[in-house]
Amino acid sequence: MKTILLISLVVIFSGCALTKAQMAVTVHNPSSFDRNYEMAEIEWKEIQKKLNLQSGENIIITNSSNEQVPYQKVTNCDYSGENLIFLTSVAAGKEESYTILKGKPENFQPLVYGRLVPERKDDFTWENNRSAFRVYGPALKATGEISNGMDYWSKKTEDLIIDKWYENDLAKISSYHSDHGEGLDFYKVGRTLGLGMTAPFDNDTLCLGDNFVTAEIIDNGPLRITIKFTYDSYFAGSHAIKETRIISLDAYSLFNKVTNTFEADTTLLTVATGIVMPVDNPEEIAETTTFGNNSGIIAYETPEDKQNGTIFTAAIHPKGFNTIKVSDGHYVGINNYQPGDKYNYFAGGGWSKAGFEDFN
């Protein structure tokens, strides 16, 4: 992930009693590259305090051209409070100014969406304006199809397409496994971690859970969707494991933020974040199709599909990986883990037919 945008806050109170209090926000980009369509984040209680917000009052955020920008109140995922996020674009080494004040916000088109899909055996599928993802639920498990991994849907439209693709597929109008102009699902998951999920790693073996049991939407647009998934207990070697995943996707981002929590009857686990390599000889092709860096990156280029192109997949752990290797048909990044801790990282990908031509 990129370095964090720096935010400075200045509260402006006019001497005129009839003028609303305003909160001046400066977003600075200290990096050497432009940061376009990213999220700035501020504690909501800070805004409430500075603007003396009362119950039922709304705010607006304006840029330096006095245009409103979209925003969203989001949770901290641990229910410790709320933050405010808003879209910002800042050139390298520059800063942008915004103003927060009371007012009536414009209606902005949602850029993220997700839902449980009971009509497709309890899939849970979510998307932003660049990609879509899904995981598999209890109704599919009841048919005998078990998968603990994350699927990737390749999109070349900024439209939100989940409902349309499911409706057309179930009505046998058009399959979302074929490209009808907006993209398709041609990523292969099966009984694997799919794109960048994490599992206990015991005796050099991935220990996979089953399909999710419950799915709870925590944040629901227009800029961020966050879902909490719970799973039935399973074993990693002799240890009983209870797993929770919280997955969050922002507008414009290629990456989900993933927070895994594993409860276990031990003080230390080994865990592996993995990207499935759906080939017969993963060890032999790893040198030309993978990229790994112990500072925290694993990446894998899927085999080229002559009709549909290539998916470039990656997982990024901000604190790095102890070991990176091919194991159990996956490219994995391995770390020690203390049960009960939050294991935070990012997982996502890009599609060659949507302008993502290589890992650069």
Identify the function of each model-found stretch.
Residues 99, 104-205:
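Solvent-exposed N-terminal domain segments of exported/luminal and surface proteins
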Residues 82-90, 313-360:
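Beta-strand-rich recognition/accessory modules
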Residues 172-251:
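Extended, loop-rich substrate-binding clefts of extracytoplasmic carbohydrate-active enzymes
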